[in-house]
């Protein structure tokens, strides 16, 4: 494994252990050239996935990009990182087990919306605002009006707490 600090290819694994949800192996590594320490994760990849963007362009699936998108929606929300990681791992497993190698980006957005709806109502609305391309305040109002059940009531409860 190449050192991210100096580019040296001679690194040593100092510690390996499974992640808490057993979906990856976490490895602590040490660079023999610069002494840098870094962590890598090894995950099972069932198949190569290609995402079909709304403009028709095809790009390789990037789990890290999915995680970044979810973390942006979850920023400053009281949700443990482990729960976010489990949600993202679940989405990836669902995508890989669909049997398709090409997946529309809208499908990923739908799966993220499903996951966020049970994780955090505010993050759900944040993600929806980007996913559904909200342009004006009325777009938020219409979306919030569509919400019903526990998610809608939890958003209203948070609003009343302020």
From Swiss-Prot:
Domain ATP-cone, chain residue ranges per copy: 49-139
Family: Belongs to the NrdR family.
Cofactor binding: number and manner: Binds 1 zinc ion.
The species this protein was found in: Parvibaculum lavamentivorans (strain DS-1 / DSM 13023 / NCIMB 13966)
Descriptive protein name: Transcriptional repressor NrdR
Molecular function per GO: ATP binding; DNA binding; zinc ion binding
Any Pfam family hit: ATP-cone
HAMAP family, alphabetized: NrdR
Swiss-Prot/TrEMBL keywords: ATP-binding, DNA-binding, Metal-binding, Nucleotide-binding, Repressor, Transcription, Transcription regulation, Zinc, Zinc-finger
């Amino acid at each position: 494994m190449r050192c991210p600090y100096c580019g040296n290819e001679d690194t040593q694994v100092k510690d390996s252990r499974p992640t808490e949800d057993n979906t990856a192996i976490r490895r602590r590594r040490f660079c023999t050239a610069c002494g840098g320490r870094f962590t890598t994760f090894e995950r099972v990849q069932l198949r190569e996935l290609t995402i079909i963007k709304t403009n028709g362009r095809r790009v390789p699936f990037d789990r890290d990009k999915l995680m970044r998108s979810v973390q942006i929606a979850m920023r400053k929300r009281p949700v443990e990182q482990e729960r976010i990681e489990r949600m993202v791992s679940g989405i990836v497993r669902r995508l890989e087990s669909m049997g398709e190698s090409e997946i529309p980006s809208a499908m990923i957005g739908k799966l993220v919306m499903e996951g966020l709806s049970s994780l955090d109502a505010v993050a759900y609305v944040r993600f929806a605002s980007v996913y559904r391309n909200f342009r004006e305040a009325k777009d938020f109002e219409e979306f919030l009006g569509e919400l019903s059940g526990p998610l809608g009531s939890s958003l209203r409860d948070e609003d009343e707490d302020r």
